Amino acid sequence: MSKIAIFPGSFDPFTKGHEDIVRRSLPLFDKVIIAIGNNAQKNRYFEIDYIIPKIESCFEKTDNVEVKVFKGLTAEFAKESGAQFLIRGLRNTTDFEYENSISQANKYLWKDLETVFMITSPHLAYISSSLIRDIHKYDGDVSGFLPYKI
């Protein structure tokens, strides 16, 4: 049986920190699905159709990474995708507190789904999508935070 993992998020935008988590997870899994959650109630800064090719360009030489969009529960998407693992990056203890409770809820929804926590690389730990959106909104240079040009 292949080890398939999903790395879910809004990825608004997909950062160098996200890319680092995916690349570091590749030796652990046969396939990693970057799962972009499409929440109709959440106003995105960058449109999903704009972000998908940007993310795909980061992994164009990697054959075991896919980018998919999903609606609904992450645990259900994992099950539908045949994924047994869910990857989450942790920058700090605040992230852990939040992600731990989400992990427990996902386990309740699907008992076979295991969450794998990966500590963010120290040089990227300060990067967040919301920080990038704030800087970009005021025409600041965000090139050092993103693995692609916007």
UniProtKB/Swiss-Prot annotation:
Reversibly transfers an adenylyl group from ATP to 4'-phosphopantetheine, yielding dephospho-CoA (dPCoA) and pyrophosphate. The keyword Repressor does not apply. Its main location: cytoplasm. Keywords: ATP-binding, Coenzyme A biosynthesis, Cytoplasm, Magnesium, Nucleotide-binding, Nucleotidyltransferase, Transferase. One of its GO terms (biological process) is coenzyme A biosynthetic process. It is found in: Cytoplasm. It comes from the Bacteria. It catalyses: (R)-4'-phosphopantetheine + ATP + H(+) = 3'-dephospho-CoA + diphosphate. Transmembrane segments: none annotated. Signal peptide: none annotated. GO terms for molecular function: ATP binding; pantetheine-phosphate adenylyltransferase activity. Its EC number is 2.7.7.3. Substrate binds at residues 10, 42, 74, 88. Homohexamer. Pathway: Cofactor biosynthesis; coenzyme A biosynthesis; CoA from (R)-pantothenate: step 4/5. Its cofactor is Mg(2+). The keyword Zinc-finger does not apply. ATP binds at residues 10-11, 18, 89-91, 99, 124-130. HAMAP family: PPAT_bact. Coiled coil: none annotated. This is Phosphopantetheine adenylyltransferase. It comes from Cytophaga hutchinsonii (strain ATCC 33406 / DSM 1761 / CIP 103989 / NBRC 15051 / NCIMB 9469 / D465). Gene3D superfamilies: HUPs (3.40.50.620). Pfam families: CTP_transf_like. Belongs to the bacterial CoaD family. The record marks 18 as: Transition state stabilizer. GO terms for cellular component: cytoplasm.
